[in-house]
Structure formats: structure tokens, C-alpha cells
A protein has these predicted regions:
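Short, conserved loop/helix-junction motifs that constitute active-site signature segments
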Residues: 83-87, 111-112
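Conserved alpha/beta-hydrolase "acid-adjacent" motif
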Residues: 99-105
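Short strand->helix junction
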Residues: 61, 99, 124-126
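Short beta-strand/loop motif that positions the catalytic acidic residue
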Residues: 86, 92-94, 98
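Active-site nucleophile elbow and catalytic-triad environment of alpha/beta-hydrolase enzymes
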Residues: 64-83
Length: 149
């Protein structure tokens, strides 16, 4: 299993807290209610053009529905609770300045036999950073070693 910046935790602040409490009621009557966020291209990588290219993608949707938001939170809680039972060899990469998924969110994987690498100065899109190919090489080497190739 190879993971990059896995969202295994979250911090709800301000309106996010309200959505977690009021969200189920909103979803009951308006399941397609749009939850919008102030997206910032600088949140994706140390190279701002990575975020800019993401925002220029014509297939990108700039919101999620209340249903998707609540299901995501529920799955994060479920998966985080199941980490102790993870029996797959696991490699985790995380940028230490990830603004989308805080670096502490991947710490629970250290409790299992996971290899967790935290990269200094990198954001969420570690494979799209200038050193992304080096990280991909590290991942490939780990896969080859783990599978005995």
C-alpha cells in the first residue's frame, strides 16, 4: 500500500464545526447542498504553479456536496479506527508543510509496520514537487524491496 498525504485526521474549525453538527439535518433536506471553501493554489505544493494548473483543470469541481463532506469525515473516522489491524506493508509520504492534510494526520500509521517519510519543505502534492521524481524513485525502490523484485 502506497499513500501520499493520507487524510487520517482532521481539525474542524469555525463553520466546519457547524457543518458536522448541522450537516446531517441539512443533508436530510438538501443532500446536494454545496459546501464551498476558499481554495488557494499555494496550498498544493511549494511550486505555486502546481496549484494553478490544478485550478485551471476544466474537470475540477470547486465544491463538494454536504453528503460527500459528511461521508468523507465518517470514512476518515472509520479508517483511522481500523489502522491497528492494517497488515499490508505500507509506505507513506507526507510533506511537512502540507496545508491540506496536516502532517500529524499520517502519524497513526507509525503504530503499524509502515514506512513513513516526512519531506521537509514540501506541500500536499509531494510527487508534483521539483523533487517528485526522486520521491517516486524512493517509492519504487521500496516496492521492489518489499516484493523481493
Amino acid at each position: 500500500l502506497v499513500l501520499s498525504g493520507p487524510p487520517l485526521g482532521y481539525e474542524l474549525e469555525g463553520s466546519d464545526k457547524v457543518l458536522k453538527v448541522a450537516g446531517p439535518l441539512i443533508r436530510r433536506f438538501r443532500p446536494g447542498f454545496e459546501v464551498r471553501d476558499e481554495f488557494d493554489p499555494a496550498n498544493y505544493a511549494s511550486d505555486i504553479t502546481v496549484g494553478e494548473r490544478f485550478f485551471e483543470d476544466p474537470l475540477r469541481v470547486d465544491f463538494m456536496t454536504i453528503s460527500l463532506a459528511l461521508e468523507t469525515i465518517g470514512e476518515i473516522d472509520r479508517v483511522t479506527g481500523a489502522i491497528a489491524g492494517l497488515a499490508l506493508p505500507t509506505w507513506v509520504g507526507h510533506g511537512d508543510v502540507d496545508r491540506l492534510v496536516p502532517v500529524w494526520a499520517s502519524e497513526p500509521l507509525e503504530s503499524v509496520a509502515a514506512v513513513r517519510k516526512v519531506y521537509d519543505g514540501l506541500g500536499h502534492e509531494i510527487l508534483n514537487e521539483p523533487v517528485g521524481l526522486d520521491i517516486a524513485d524512493e517509492m519504487a525502490a521500496w516496492i521492489e524491496q518489499t516484493l523481493g523484485l
